[in-house]
Amino acid sequence: MIKIKNLVKKYGENTVLKDVTLDVADKEIVALLGPSGAGKTTIINLLTGMIKPDGGEIQVDATPREVGLMLDVGGIYSHLNCLENLNLYARIYGLPTSRSMEVLESVGLADSAKKAASELSRGMNQRLSLARAIIYSPKLLILDEPTSALDPGTGKSICELLEKLREDGATIFLTTHNMDEALKLCDRVALLHEGEIVKQGEPVALCEEYNALRTVPDLESVFLQLTGVKL
């Protein structure tokens, strides 16, 4: 579904991505893990065409209408309420407006349907952005930190929703710095540090390789051993 090969991105003399290679297979959930400034959002911006690479190749086997995006900014109209925001996208994609409430329910915002986006908390805005991304059931979801502003209980519910979307046929590529979330949700993870992927693989297998199983698998310990950086 996604193929990234030897990707390079520079800003002036600063190389922010260094020879990044990563694949995401059909109906797979893959997370890009790393601290702030590691290059996660840069990769998302390259995938979505917002910026251009300075080297390497990117292939996405989906048309723009088959890709649902949840980015840090954009896509939500602050003067509209939650339901109006989704109804706008429902009309664009030729969907019945009943789909809007269905999706709001799935992200836990049904009770806030008539609340203006400008009045939402950061976490609620994040869930509204996810609702916008999934309203037309895209076959590929690209999500930038989809649970970063959520409390643990709500974050768990959103992870369960993402797993259901995958069961329904979606491929999901996301960025996160939440190791527990990645461990429970993802088929594979790629650990990104200072613009380089230092390791990638199945989460529990990585924990086994680096003796980080302990009582429960600990991806944070794996990252610390590989980079010297604690998340």
Region roles according to the model:
Residues 48:
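Helix-to-loop junction immediately C-terminal to a conserved catalytic motif
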Residues 87, 91, 96-112:
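Conserved ABC ATPase "signature" region
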Residues 116-123:
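Conserved ABC ATPase signature
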Residues 141-144:
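Catalytic Walker B motif of ABC-type/P-loop ATPase nucleotide-binding domains
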Residues 182-184:
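A short, surface-exposed alpha-helical micro-motif characterized by mixed small hydrophobic
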Residues 200-201:
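ABC ATPase "signature
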